Curated annotation (Swiss-Prot):
Biased composition (Acidic residues): 494-504
Molecular function terms from GO: enzyme regulator activity
PANTHER family assigned to the protein according to its UniProt record, in alphabetical order: 26S PROTEASOME NON-ATPASE REGULATORY SUBUNIT 3, 26S PROTEASOME NON-ATPASE REGULATORY SUBUNIT 3/COP9 SIGNALOSOME COMPLEX SUBUNIT 3
Key words, A-Z: Proteasome
Protein name: 26S proteasome non-ATPase regulatory subunit 3
Self-association and partners: The 26S proteasome is composed of a core protease, known as the 20S proteasome, capped at one or both ends by the 19S regulatory complex (RC). The RC is composed of at least 18 different subunits in two subcomplexes, the base and the lid, which form the portions proximal and distal to the 20S proteolytic core, respectively.
Domain PCI, first and last residues per copy: 254-434
Similarity annotation: Belongs to the proteasome subunit S3 family.
Function (record text): Acts as a regulatory subunit of the 26 proteasome which is involved in the ATP-dependent degradation of ubiquitinated proteins.
Source organism of the structure: Dictyostelium discoideum (Social amoeba)
GO biological process: regulation of protein catabolic process; ubiquitin-dependent protein catabolic process
Disulfide bonds: none
Matches recorded under PROSITE patterns: PCI
Endpoints of the signal sequence: none
């Protein structure tokens, strides 16, 4: 039995675990990336030859996925592959000067079969400017990812000169990406002000050439540039003197609405700011762009508090927003209960966060709202209360005269319904009026209806219909109309004949 068991066991093959060589794995990944880049070059050439933008746009959609796979060796291969002709030696050497090995990359066989392969577009002396700009853009993105910002600014400046000196329509989709990374490279070196004149010139050119996506991108970059240096007046003038293209993408619209919301909030136009920020959230991607959504919700919560409204609690409990909005949740709690002490404590503890979020100025304006909320609460609880007691309950550190002026302003704004007795030194509350007997519910429903109608109209504008979808129905209606017209003419002729016979 033992011999039988051993013989059966010996028949079972022993499979050795396959050891994966890291260098070989890196080689295979680089070869696949190189093949993808060659395919993208072919698509760009096809888009240029057929004047079809969709091929170039499909290549740009793959930028984020390819961006993660880029490395020094792959970019060297694709630059040598695309600029193989001697006529492009200057451009080739310029790009290769940025692709210096840092010693951390694994060695990859540079004489692979992939490099030996050529295509007609690469072997010929002619190279489309779109392909040249695409490869240049990949090198720029790689430099930014490697945090080589000084090299990135030089690379982006040369790329901008190439784009501005060409007027080809097929370069428009690439130009919007180039504008963005050009501004980003200078922002990383804290020299964002240097690109302002270049972007203004590019905006004029894009407007004259009807480059809608490029125009939308540049407007957003200029708004970001102005707001970075707190130049709100210049940003407002830019909004007044430019028209944002309606054919821009949803992402560009989301950024545009956010910048408008920030500008209106600084200008004390909180209702307009709330409208723009709400539209920005609606236009932004729902499953991605978490950082953008957090930024918008931070500003939106402050604007709602400045409007006298309290943000919904479930906004602060969302998984993506819970940690980022925690300081703003403490502010909301302080404003809601009208506790000036809690507000000062939250402001002191989170002042650095508010400054980094660029909301510190708006948060400081909430002090009067906290006092108003506290006064509203006291006005509901007491029919009559002295000014000294109001200062004590609100933890107000000013004088009685100061609180008297604040109460007068609160009554004038319609926050509370009360009267001030200066001789007795107290606040006299009036009877509470039922809100449903006023016009407030009507205005609230009207605002909601307007929002729903706007969403409906935007959805209709965003829908696409096949041009031949209703062709059959149109032809059928035309035939019916033609038949009716012929029948009416025939009846008219018969009636005229009958009249002629009767006269005879």
């Amino acid at each position: 039995m033992a011999d039988i068991e051993m013989s059966e066991a010996s028949k079972t093959p022993v499979v050795a675990e396959e050891v994966v060589d890291p260098v070989q794995k890196a080689n295979e990944a680089s070869l696949l990336t190189f093949a993808d880049l060659k395919k993208n070059i072919g698509l760009i050439d096809k888009g240029v030859d057929t004047k079809e933008m969709r091929f170039i746009i499909s290549v740009l959609r793959q930028t984020q996925s390819i961006r993660k796979k880029l490395n020094y060796k792959v970019l060297n291969q694709i630059v040598n592959f695309a600029f193989s002709h001697q006529n492009h030696a200057t451009k080739k050497n310029f790009l290769l000067s940025f692709l210096k090995s840092d010693g951390s990359s694994m060695d990859i066989d540079s004489t692979t079969q992939a490099e030996k392969e050529t295509t007609p577009s690469s072997s010929s002396s002619h190279l489309n400017i779109e392909v040249e700009s695409y490869i240049h853009l990949l090198v720029l993105i790689y430099l930014i990812d490697q945090k080589k910002y000084e090299d990135a600014t030089k690379c982006s400046s040369a790329l901008m000169e190439t784009v501005q000196s060409n007027t080809r329509i097929t370069l428009y989709p690439l130009s919007s990406k180039i504008f963005f990374y050009y501004s980003l490279s200078y922002e990383m070196t804290n020299n964002l002000h240097e690109v302002r004149s270049t972007l203004l010139s590019a905006l004029r050119t894009a407007t004259l050439r009807h480059n809608d996506e490029g125009q939308a991108t540049i407007i957003n970059l200029l708004l970001r540039n102005y707001l970075e240096y707190n130049l709100f007046e210049q940003a407002d003038k830019l909004l007044a003197n430019t028209q944002f293209p309606e054919s821009a993408s949803s992402n560009q619209f989301a950024r545009y609405f956010y910048y408008q919301g920030r500008i209106r909030a600084i200008q004390l136009e909180y209702a307009e700011s709330f409208k723009f920020l709400t539209q920005a959230i609606r236009k932004a991607p729902q499953n991605t762009a978490g950082g953008f959504r957090r930024t918008v919700y931070k500003l939106l919560s402050i604007v709602q508090l400045l409007m006298g409204e309290i943000p919904e609690r479930n906004t602060f409990s969302q998984k993506q927003l819970k940690i980022a909005l925690k300081p703003y949740f403490h502010l909301t709690e302080a404003v809601r209960v009208g506790d000036l002490g809690s507000f000062n404590q939250a402001l002191e503890q989170n002042s650095d966060i508010f400054k980094s979020d660029q909301t510190f100025t708006l948060v400081q304006r909430l002090r009067s709202n906290v006092i108003k909320a506290g006064l509203k609460k006291l006005n509901t609880a007491y029919s009559r209360i002295s000014f000294n007691d109001i200062c004590t309950k609100l933890k107000f550190d000013g004088t009685t005269q100061d609180i008297m002026f604040i109460i007068a302003k609160t009554i004038k704004d319609g926050v509370i319904d009360a009267t001030i007795n200066y001789e007795g030194g107290y606040l006299q509350s009036r009877e509470n009026i039922d809100a449903y007997s006023t016009q407030e519910p009507l205005h609230a429903f009207s605002n909601r209806i307007d929002i729903c109608l706007k969403i409906h109209n935007d959805s209709l504008k965003a829908m696409r219909f096949h041009p031949d979808l209703n062709k059959a129905e149109t032809e059928k209606i035309a035939e019916v109309a033609k038949t009716i017209k012929e029948e009416m003419e025939r009846q008219a002729e018969e009636s005229s004949d009958n009249e002629g016979d009767s006269d005879f």
